[in-house]
Swiss-Prot record:
Compositionally biased intervals (Basic and acidic residues): 265-285, 426-463, 523-534, 551-571, 632-646, 1692-1701
Chain positions recorded as ATP binding sites: D858, E859, M860, G861, L862, G863, K864, T865
Organism: Neosartorya fischeri (strain ATCC 1020 / DSM 3700 / CBS 544.65 / FGSC A1164 / JCM 1740 / NRRL 181 / WB 181) (Aspergillus fischerianus)
Amino acid composition bias (Basic residues), ranges on this chain: 507-522, 1675-1691
Name by which UniProt lists this protein: Chromatin-remodeling ATPase INO80
Residues covered by the Helicase ATP-binding domain: 845-1017
Domain Helicase C-terminal: 1422-1582
Record keywords, A-Z: Activator, ATP-binding, Coiled coil, DNA damage, DNA repair, DNA-binding, Hydrolase, Nucleotide-binding, Nucleus, Transcription, Transcription regulation
Region entry Disordered, spans: 1-312, 410-584, 626-648, 718-750, 1643-1708
Subunit (UniProt): Component of the INO80 chromatin-remodeling complex.
Gene: ino80
Root EC class: hydrolase
Family as reported in the entry's similarity comment: Belongs to the SNF2/RAD54 helicase family.
Motif position, DEAQ box: 968-971
Coiled-coil regions, chain positions: 395-478, 634-706
Length: 1708
């Protein structure tokens, strides 16, 4: 925002309604009321126009701005003077240019504008100024003070800047006329009665009429400065005063009297608003005022002429003068009160807003400038830092490299020495061990005690040697143990001998014998000097330089000689060897010499020989070098000089390669060392963190145990003792309903209540002392109990009627502790609770009283719903708490909840909250507000809704105070990061209850999400706790490790206060058993081909490596591969359906639009036409062109019909009868069994009609065609009527021999080929050949409607079609159905001959065989056998699938087998689910119920079925467990058998193995059992993607991969991570799990608008599997073949499937 005014120069709001002066020029428009624009800090405006909407109303002027109007000094100018008292004295001129961009000169220079009285800026008027000439009696505003202009004026009168909020500029207003005082005064009578000023053309300036001269005014300049007006005064309009103030210097002359003749004629006046508008819009002339030019001079302005007005009559003038006098004498109104205070306040608000916007914009620009400056400064510093680094590197790099190289060389030498020393010591240990064993063996065999003691001493000596050597190997420098030192003999004469130190070993005899060596020891410096000299000599030999031999008189030799002499002189004289005559000494002596002769002498000999050969080889090399050096001067030729450059280059290349290789090796070694250091540091840190986590875990578990101790113990039934339930015995205290004073107080804590620790960082978990941790845990537990009680009290305290009720019946202010509570079943509950359900009710009631939330985790089918309903009934019946209760359940169970509550507790009203947004809005009208008490007469008590709707309408649910919130299937909130979990956690409810049959589904984190939800104060921020559970328990299930029993016990102690779980087999004895069976199936030939082709197209090793890198695209590809393999296992038709085959049809086919508008029955016309058509003229097809059809143009046809068919027709009945009577031509009819009427009718029928009539007549002489020799000949002959023997027609009916008879052996003998064809079943097999093409018959084409109608009547003749195909018409079928008639009498055999092939019928269209459809899948073939057995046994089946596409295929199979079924999946509507389940439960004829595991596995009761079949198992075993418990639940009296179809040797076996591991996790955590019976030696949890890749491999490949991974681990590498490159550094996005891909659209069973899953979309593999499997797949990346590789853009489902199926890259 720039501080320029928001209005354009021509805005009418910038002008007063009654101007005081006229502008001096068209291009310079000054406005007397512009001081309000000075409130914004002036800045350079942008060059664009403002919005047109910023224009103000033209009818009202606005109050001046109270804000200061000063400009900041430019270029160090002086600050502006203080604000003056009259705000209207400061003006701001606007430029008339479009986008003025002028520089700002110094604003306070006096040379820019003159301050004389002629300047228009020196006119002083108020915000509602009046003309300068007026009556004395009128009120007037205070005079203006002359002020200096604040803005410089440009050459055209515009200021030096323009507003960024201006509109498009327009020409300035023309100069205005100066009228008479009465004409200019809006309140004067003349102004009221005068007509509107006539408008002139834009170019001509109007002038005053001559009869009205302009009044002369004298303006006296005011004093130059006045005191500034306070801000409070400037904020209000100036006060109204009557008369002129005493300080006014303005002198106004009285107007001259106006003659009556000069007055205008009285005419009809317009309205006040119109007059005011006209007065504002009309140009007015004024006196010639000076106009400032470009150089500051002033030019007078000429007054323009105006047209003369009409004069009034004398009578009119007298009337006007009289009225004027009355008006002048009347009381004047307060003209200074404009009545626009609201506009003024609005303007003030807008001005402040503009100032704030300007400040905000300036702040943004200031931040941007500061940011740019800091960026530039940072770049400068960075450049200087880099330069300094380069200078330092250039100065010190060489020395550092040399130092590092020298250090590395020295370290390598020391390492080699250490290794040699280590090997020698290990060899010594091994030899001494052998000696020790040998000595012990001899000692055991020795009979003499002395000899045995000798051997034992040798063994002891060897043992000491071994210990000392091992100590040296381990680098231990501690002194020998006291037991290893030989004890000193006591000195009886005076203590012990003190000349030997106990901590020092005795000197060796062998060493003392060698003490007299002639060779002196060399110091380390001497050895290094000799090495340096040797290296220098070798370097000189290599460079062909003379050896730097020491001179003969070298002082070093003299020094060495002196040192040797001094050493010899210092050697002590050896003492004479004393001889010993003992036998042991002699044996040791002889043994020493034998060892020397056998070992040391050959060793020394070898050393000497090797030294001699080395010396000779060195001398030989030296001689060769010397001879070469001596011959060099002879071999120097021109050729050798030319080769110098080549040799130098080769040498340089070799040196470069050597140093590169050397640097690479050094770098690798350095990296390896750094890696080892980092790993060791990580290991140490991991150990420290493990100890810390252990203490933190101990703290958290202790805290929860204390909480459990404080709130009491959970109720436990007698039948649950054997189930391993975590419940313990309760206390003896019970709740006594009706006694308000009965309370049970908790014991006081020994810890300080005020020491609650909410931040774990404040606790020192590294300290060894755990006293502080125990105290903090106890304090936190007690605070948690206290907070739960206070929260319950606070909730009850807000309900005033409820509090009064509590005082009479039950005191909720002092909740009791948890114990054995004997609560009877509520009377309003119509059902009878079982024993364990009643105990569950007791537990839930006590949780409610304590204000504690809980998890009811009974196994599915034990009645969690009825227990929850009984709690609500108990609260309503005993404590008169009628709600509101909130029940949230999956969408598929909403109707079940509504029905159960209405059925079991009719007194409780249920509000079903679901439907569209409009319906839910209507339902919310029934909600009571939060402060209204719910009673029995309330609109509703329980609201039932779904998880999805709760999230959508969470803002409405959060406004209601819920007494009890029940979450059914609580695993829906297992993720603490989901919006569903967060929204539900924010609901205002007294208690929460979670119902779930599977508290643990995939990992322990989901259990902790539920614990967080029910107790957020106790289980807050326990990430380490959750990680501990996931790491220890799941690794226990995977690696078969031993879980700490104490930790498991304490885990169960944590779950005890919050979770109650019972198992069916312990609490429900009458419930039938559940038997699970795994049915293994084999792959068929087609499935094996698909499976092998898929596996050959992918490399398992590449998948493992990509999985190790962690690329998101590769992980998605891997998941897609798993899906394709599972499709192959289910059915190969999921990839490619068998196609319907037919010959190529050559013809035209009609096209139609969508069939959606057609309704149920679609009338398909015969529209197929041949490409060849025979065109006929319209004349031939019409009646006029037909000879036999009568018409207006065909008289011959009428003649024929009249004479040939009637008058001259011989087949008339009269003629036939006369002929028969006279034995004429028709006398044969008596031998043809034909009457006269039949002969007449047949004469008028065609061939087809006569054939149809003969179809129903039986041949009574057919038995005469065959000779029978059995006993029935007599009966047969009797069946033939005597008069039929003379029937000449039937007797002479000649026909083929094969058609003589239709039954018996004769028929078989006459039709051998046909009978054989039928008996062999050749007519029911698929035809092996079919024609390549077919075409409809050639038709006649005519453009007339008559021909088309006849063609349609012929083709679609109902009677003809019925006779040929024996298909009744639609009307006949409808009548048969309506009247419920037997269709047999109305259906005759067709007249068409029987087709040769029953499969092909009369066409050559081949439909895929359903038998082959069944046998193509191993699973489906096994299922077919299983269903046949189950159907015969009277069982009913629940059939679960993972893919909705497979359900579609299964529907075709069940239709083929004529099994009645019903279907429920994710696409089934909510209202249809209830009806489908009810049909299956009530109709026993329905054999199979097809369900998807996710949609049909929750909340529905299907106890009518006793068999569950999983066609393909889910990834999560809990989902399958929930699905099978749809049948195995309360109400099931039969044994439930569960069949699981698993394809042997495929990915499904490994998926099942993984599911067993998850089940083991649940069993360990919930029941506390130990792992066993299942092999959990699988891969680690961190490599989940690698595990999935391992599923695709067979056993041999898996073994090979594990072996390679083990080898890589031994080398210290990560298997498959070497080829990762930069991909390893990429962060993974949100994982697209296999569950999401499989159950897309159907997994969310509470989603009403779920669509069928698209994961099982069939993929065309006609081209995929035709490619040879050995074709290598081109790899992606640079330098890896010609394959482009797929891009990293987001791919569609089709592209991903193509990429998986091997269609190559996705080249466009």
């Amino acid at each position: 925002m720039t501080g320029a005014p928001p209005y354009n120069p021509q805005s009418p709001t910038q002008q007063p309604r009654f101007p005081v002066y006229s502008p001096p020029n068209k291009n310079r428009s000054y406005y007397p009321n512009n001081d309000q624009y000075q409130q914004h800090p002036p800045q350079t405006p942008p060059a664009f126009a403002p919005q047109p909407s910023l224009s103000r109303s033209p009818h009202y002027s606005h109050a001046p701005s109270p804000l200061p109007a000063t400009l900041p000094p430019l270029n160090g100018g002086a600050p502006p003077p203080g604000h003056h008292s009259e705000p209207s004295s400061q003006y701001q001129a606007h430029s008339s240019a479009g986008t003025p961009q002028f520089s700002l000169p110094r604003p306070y220079s006096a040379s820019m504008m003159s301050s004389n009285g002629a300047s228009p800026y020196n006119h002083s008027t108020s915000s509602h100024a009046h003309p300068s000439a007026r009556l004395e009696s009128l009120s007037q505003s205070p005079p203006k003070k002359e002020t200096e202009p604040l803005y410089p004026i440009g050459g055209n009168g515009a200021p030096g800047y323009s507003s960024s909020m201006m509109r498009e500029p327009r020409p300035a207003s023309p100069p205005r006329e100066t009228k008479h005082a009465r004409a200019a005064d809006p309140m004067s009578f003349a102004s009221i009665l005068s007509g509107p000023t006539e408008e002139s053309s834009p170019k001509k300036q109007p002038s005053l009429p001559e009869a009205l001269p302009a009044p002369a005014t004298t303006i006296t300049p005011p004093p130059p400065a006045l005191a500034p007006v306070p801000a409070r005064r400037r904020l209000t309009p100036p006060p109204v005063t009557h008369g002129l103030p005493p300080t006014s210097q303005l002198k106004v002359k009285e107007p001259e009297p106006i003659s009556p003749a000069a007055l205008p004629r009285l005419e009809k006046k317009p309205g006040a608003e119109k007059r005011r508008r006209n007065a504002e819009q009309e140009p007015k002339s004024a006196e010639a005022l000076p106009v400032a030019s470009a150089n500051g001079a002033f030019e007078p302005t000429k007054a323009a002429r105006v047209s003369n007005r009409k004069t009034l009559t004398e009578r009119d003038a007298e009337t006007i003068n009289k009225i004027i006098a009355e008006i002048d004498n009347a009381d004047k109104s307060d003209v200074e009160s404009p009545g626009f205070e609201a506009e003024y306040d609005g303007y003030i608000v807008k001005s402040k807003k503009r100032a704030l916007d300007a400040e905000k914009a300036e702040g943004i620009r200031r931040k941007r400038r500061r940011h740019d400056f800091l960026v530039k400064l940072g770049k400068t510093f960075e450049k200087q830092a880099n330069a300094g680094v380069d200078r330092f590197r250039a100065a010190n790099e060489a020395s550092v490299i040399a130092e590092v190289q020298a250090k590395e060389i020295q370290d390598e030498k020391e390492r080699k020495k250490d290794m040699q020393r280590k090997r020698r010591r290990e060899n010594t240990v091994r030899l001494e061990m052998q000696k020790k064993l040998e000595a012990e063996r001899k000692a055991n065999k020795a009979n003499d005690a002395a000899e045995k003691a000798k051997f034992l001493r040798e063994a002891e000596r060897a043992q000491r040697k071994i210990k000392s050597t091992k100590r040296a190997l381990e680098g231990v420098t501690s002194p020998e143990e006291i037991g290893e030192v030989t004890p000193l003999a006591p000195n009886l004469e005076g203590g012990t001998t003190s000349s030997f130190h106990i901590g020092r070993s005795s000197p060796s005899r062998r060493k003392s014998g060698r003490s007299g060596t002639s060779r002196p020891k060399k110091s380390k410096e001497q050895k290094q000097a000799e090495k340096d000299a040797a290296e220098a000599a070798y370097a000189a030999m290599e460079n062909d330089e003379p050896l730097p031999l020491a001179p003969k008189e070298d002082p070093r030799k003299e020094t060495l000689k002196k040192e040797a002499k001094g050493a010899r002189s210092k050697e002590p004289t050896p003492s004479p060897v004393s001889t010993f005559e003992s036998k042991g000494y002699n044996q040791i002596y002889e043994q020493i010499w034998r060892d020397i002769a056998r070992k040391d002498i050959p060793k020394v000999y070898r050393i000497k020989t090797l030294s001699l050969s080395t010396r000779q080889e060195n001398l030989r090399k030296t001689a060769q070098l010397a001879s070469k050096q001596s011959r060099k001067w002879q071999e120097r030729t021109n050729k050798s000089m030319k080769d110098t450059q080549a040799r130098a280059k080769r040498t340089m290349r070799e040196m470069m390669s050597f140093w590169k290789r050397n640097e690479r090796e050094e770098r690798d070694l350095r990296r390896l060392a750094e890696k080892q250091e980092i790993e060791s540091a990580k290991k140490a840190e991991a150990e420290r963190e493990a100890n810390r986590q252990k203490r933190k875990l101990n703290f958290l578990i202790s805290q929860t145990e204390l909480y459990s101790h404080f709130i009491g113990r959970k109720i436990k039934g007698a039948g649950a003792d054997s189930s391993g339930d975590t419940a313990v015995d309760g206390s003896d205290e019970t709740i006594q309903p009706g006694k308000a004073d009965h309370t049970i107080d908790l014991p006081p804590s020994v810890a300080d209540v005020g020491t609650k620790v909410t931040n774990f960082e404040d606790l020192d978990f590294d300290a060894e002392d755990e006293t502080a941790l125990r105290q903090a845990a106890m304090a936190n537990a007690q605070n948690a109990v206290k907070e739960a009680q206070e929260r319950a009290r606070a909730f009850n305290a807000e309900e005033n009627p409820m509090a009064a009720l509590d005082e009479g019946e039950l005191n909720f202010q002092n909740p009791t502790s948890l114990g054995d509570i004997e609560i009877s079943q509520p009377k309003m509950l119509t059902a009878k609770l079982k024993e364990y359900q009643l105990k569950g009710l007791n537990w839930l009631v006590n949780l409610y009283e304590q204000g504690i939330n809980g998890i009811l985790a009974d196994e599915m089918g034990l009645g969690k719903t009825i227990q929850s309903i009984s709690v609500m009934a108990y609260l309503a019946e005993v404590h008169n708490i009628w709600g509101p209760f909130l029940v949230i359940a999956p969408a598929s169970t909403l109707h079940n909840w509504q029905q159960e509550i209405t059925k079991f507790v009719p007194d409780i009203k249920v509000l079903p909250y679901w439907g569209s947004a409009k319906d839910r809005k209507v339902l919310r009208k029934f909600w009571d507000r939060k402060h209204i008490t719910y009673t029995k007469e309330s609109e509703f008590h329980v609201l039932v809704t779904s998880y999805q709707l709760v999230v959508l309408d969470s803002q409405y649910f959060q406004k209601v105070k819920w007494q009890y919130m029940i979450l059914d299937e609580a695993q829906a909130i297992k993720s603490s990061q989901s919006s569903r979990w967060k929204n539900l956690l924010g609901f205002h409810c007294r208690n929460r209850l979670l119902l779930t049959g599977t508290p643990i589904q995939n990992n322990m984190q989901e259990l902790w999400a539920l614990l967080h939800f029910i107790m957020p104060t106790l289980f807050d921020s326990h990430d380490e706790f959750s990680e501990w559970f996931s790491k220890d328990i799941e690794s226990h299930a995977q690696s078969n490790t031993k879980l700490n029993e104490d930790q498991l016990r304490r885990l169960h102690m944590i779950l005890k206060p919050f979770m109650l779980r019972r198992v069916k087999k312990h609490v429900q004895q009458e419930l039938g058993d559940k038997v699970e069976k795994d049915v293994f199936c084999d792959l068929t030939y087609r499935q094996r081909a698909y499976y092998a082709n898929l596996r050959n197209r992918v490399s398992i090793m590449d998948l493992i490596e990509k999985a190790a890198v962690g690329d998101e695209a590769d992980s998605t590809t891997l998941m897609n591969l798993v899906m394709q393999f599972r499709k192959v296992c289910n059915h190969p038709d999921l990839f490619e359906r068998a196609e319907t085959k037919s010959p190529f049809s050559v013809g035209y086919f009609a096209e139609t639009a969508s069939f959606v508008r057609e309704g149920q029955n679609v009338d398909v016309r015969y529209s197929t036409r041949n490409l060849i058509e025979y065109s006929l003229p319209r004349l031939l097809c019409s009646s006029s062109g037909r000879v036999d059809m009568a018409g207006p143009g065909n008289e011959q046809a009428g003649f024929r019909g009249k004479y040939l068919q009637h008058l001259m027709n011989i087949f008339t009945p009269e003629n036939i009868k006369r002929s028969i009577d006279e034995d004429g031509g028709f006398s044969f009819l008596r031998f043809a069994d034909t009457s006269i009427n039949e002969a007449y009718e047949q004469s008028h029928l065609g061939v087809f009609e006569r054939a149809v009539r003969r179809r129903g007549q039986s041949n009574r002489l057919s038995r005469l065609n065959v000779i029978y020799d059995d006993e029935e000949d007599e009966q047969t002959s009797k069946s033939v009527l005597p008069h039929s023997l003379f029937n000449i027609v039937q007797r002479n009916d000649r026909q083929a021999v094969r058609n003589v008879t239709v039954e018996g052996y004769m028929r078989d003998l006459m039709n051998v080929s046909e009978v054989t064809f039928e008996r062999e079943g050749l007519d029911v097999i698929e035809p092996s050949a079919s024609p390549a093409a077919s075409a409809p018959p050639i038709t006649i084409s005519c453009s007339g409607q008559v021909a088309l109608r006849e063609t349609q009547d012929s083709f679609f003749n109902v009677s003809v079609r019925h006779a040929l195909f024996s298909t009744p018409s639609r009307q006949m079928e409808q009548q048969i159905l309506e009247k419920k008639l037997d269709p047999a009498p109305f259906s005759l055999p067709p007249m068409l001959p029987k087709p040769i092939s029953t499969k092909g019928r009369y066409t050559h269209i081949e439909v895929p065989s359903m038998r082959r459809f069944v046998t193509d899948s191993g699973k489906l073939a096994k299922l077919d056998e299983l269903l046949r057995e189950l159907k015969a046994g009277g069982h009913r089946v629940l059939l679960y699938f993972q893919m909705t596409r497979m359900i579609d295929l299964m529907e075709e199979y069940l239709t083929y087998r004529n099994y009645k079924y019903c279907r429920l999946d994710g696409s089934t509507k909510l209202e249809d689910r209830r009806d489908t389940v009810a049909d299956f439960q009530q109709r026993p004829e329905i054999f199979v119920f097809l369900l998807s595991t996710r949609a049909g596995g929750l909340g529905i009761n299907l106890t009518a079925a006793d068999t569950v079949i999983f066609y393909d198992s889910d990834w999560n075993p809990t989902i399958d467990s929930q699905a099978m418990d749809r049948a195995h639940r309360l109400g099931q009296t039969r044994q439930v058998t569960v069949y699981r179809l698993i394809t042997r040797g495929t990915i499904e076996e490994r998926i099942r193995k993984r599911a067993l591991q998850k089940e083991e996790v649940q069993r360990v955590v919930i029941s506390g059992g130990a792992a066993g019976g299942v092999d959990f030696n699988t891969r680690n949890r961190e490599s989940r993607t690698k595990d999935i890749a391992m599923w695709l491999a067979d056993d041999e490949q898996a073994e090979l991969i594990e072996q390679k991974e083990k080898e890589a681990l031994d080398r210290g590498e990560v298997f498959g991570a070497g080829k990762g490159g930069k991909k390893a550094a990429q962060k993974r996005k949100k994982d697209l799990t296999l569950d999401d891909m499989y159950h897309e659209g159907e997994g969310n069973f509470d989603d009403i608008s779920a669509k069928p899953s698209g994961a099982a979309t069939p993929v065309s593999t006609a081209d995929n599997f035709g490619t040879p499997s050995s074709t290598p797949v081109p790899k992606r990346g640079r330098g890896r073949g010609t394959g482009k590789g797929s891009s990293k853009r987001a791919k569609t489902t089709t592209e991903r499937l193509r990429l998986i199926d091997g269609d190559g890259g996705l080249e466009s």
